[in-house]
From Swiss-Prot:
Key words of the record: Cytoplasm, Methyltransferase, rRNA processing, S-adenosyl-L-methionine, Transferase
Localisation per UniProt entry: Cytoplasm
Gene source species: Synechococcus sp. (strain CC9311)
Residues the record lists as binding S-adenosyl-L-methionine: 47-49, 66, 93, 108, 115
GO annotation, biological process: rRNA base methylation
A GO CC term assigned to this protein in UniProt: cytoplasm
Gene name tied to this protein: rsmH
Protein name: Ribosomal RNA small subunit methyltransferase H
Length: 310
C-alpha cells in the first residue's frame, strides 16, 4: 500500500517522456512475461509511466520507488484506480532489493517538471529559491549552498567540469568563491544563476540553453550522488530480472547515457534490444521540450542466465 495518504490536490503534473516508444517495446515481448508478475518503477515520480504499464498489462503488480515525498503523494493519487496492484516504497532505488524476480525494471533519470518548477526545491535557475537541490530534504544531507561553501575553488571547478561538462568551470568557480567571500552566501538560486551567466560573453548568454544549466546540473548531481546511485542500479538491476525480463533506462545527459551504454555492453546477463537508443520524435519534442535530450536504452535478461547478484 502507499506510504503516503492520497491527495487529489497534489500539485505534481508530469508528462512521461518516450512513453509510447516504451510501451511499444514492452508490448512486443512475450505475453507470458506480463502475467502474474511484478515490475519495478525505480523512479516513480508522478506515476506517468507506471499508469500506462498498469493499464496495458492487467497481470502485473507494480512496485514504485521514490525518495521524494511530494512525488509519492502525487503518484498515489494518479494510481488510485490500481491500488490493489501497487506498492509505493519511500526509498532511493540504490537501497532497494526486490523480494522476487521481476519482469521489468524502469528508471527515468530526469528531474521531473514539478521539481524544476517549484522554486522552494532549489533546482531551478529560472525561479528564485533556496540553494537546496536535495531530492529528499527530509533525510537531511548537505545542500548545494553548504557544498559550494565547503569546497575550495579547485575542488569546485573540478566538480563543475566533471558533472556539468562545463568548459568555463574554473572561471565560474572563481566567481562563486569570490562572491561568497564578499557576501557570505548567495541569496538564492537566481543570484547564483546570475553570477554564472556573468562568466559568459554577452552573446553566449542569449542562446537557447541558459548559461547556468551545466553548473546547476553539476551541483544537483553532486548533492544527490546521482551517478553513484546510477552505477549501483546498473550493477544490481540485472540480478532482479527474470529470464527475458526488461531493463529500460531513460537518461537526459551524456554522463548518464555513457554509463548505461557501457553497462549494457559489458553486462553478460543482458542483451540489448537495439544498438542505438530511442529518442523523442519531433512531435514529442514540440509537445514536451524536456524530451529533447532524452535517450531510452532497453536490454533484456538473457534466458540462459540464473538470477544472481552482480
Amino acid at each position: 500500500m502507499p506510504d503516503h495518504p492520497l491527495s487529489s490536490g497534489v500539485a505534481f503534473s508530469h508528462v512521461p517522456v518516450l512513453a509510447e516508444t516504451l510501451m511499444q517495446v514492452l508490448s512486443e515481448q512475450p505475453p507470458i512475461l506480463w502475467q502474474n508478475t511484478a515490475v519495478i518503477d525505480a523512479t516513480l515520480g508522478g506515476g506517468g509511466h507506471s499508469k500506462l504499464i498498469l493499464e496495458r498489462f492487467p497481470g502485473v503488480r507494480l512496485v514504485g520507488l521514490d525518495q521524494d515525498p511530494s512525488a509519492r503523494a502525487a503518484a498515489a493519487s494518479r494510481l488510485e484506480p490500481f491500488l490493489d496492484r501497487v506498492q509505493i516504497v519511500p526509498v532511493n532505488f540504490a537501497a532497494f532489493e526486490p523480494p522476487e524476480p521481476v519482469s521489468l525494471v524502469l528508471a527515468d533519470l530526469g528531474v521531473s517538471s514539478p521539481q524544476l518548477d517549484v522554486a522552494s526545491r532549489g533546482f531551478s535557475f529560472r525561479l528564485d529559491g533556496p540553494l537546496d537541490m536535495r531530492m529528499n530534504p527530509v533525510a537531511g544531507g548537505e545542500t548545494a549552498e553548504e557544498m559550494i561553501a565547503r569546497l575550495d575553488v579547485n575542488a569546485l571547478a573540478d566538480l563543475i567540469y566533471a558533472f556539468g561538462e562545463e568548459r568555463l568551470s574554473r572561471r565560474i568557480a572563481r566567481r562563486i568563491k569570490a562572491d561568497l567571500e564578499a557576501e557570505g552566501a548567495y541569496a538564492g538560486t537566481a543570484a547564483l544563476a546570475y553570477a554564472v551567466a556573468g562568466c559568459y560573453p554577452p552573446k553566449a548568454r542569449r542562446g537557447r540553453i541558459h548559461p547556468a544549466t551545466r553548473t546547476f546540473q553539476a551541483l544537483r548531481i553532486a548533492v544527490n550522488d546521482e551517478l553513484g546511485v546510477l552505477d549501483r542500479l546498473l550493477q544490481t538491476a540485472p540480478g532482479w530480472l527474470k529470464p527475458g525480463g526488461v531493463l529500460a533506462i531513460i537518461s537526459f545527459h551524456s554522463l548518464e547515457d555513457r554509463r548505461v551504454k557501457t553497462a549494457f555492453l559489458q553486462e553478460e546477463r543482458l542483451e540489448r534490444v537495439t544498438r542505438k537508443p530511442f529518442m523523442a520524435s519531433e512531435q514529442e519534442q514540440a509537445d514536451n521540450p524536456r524530451s529533447r535530450s532524452a535517450k531510452l536504452r532497453i536490454a533484456r535478461r538473457r534466458p540462459d542466465t540464473a538470477r544472481s547478484g552482480p
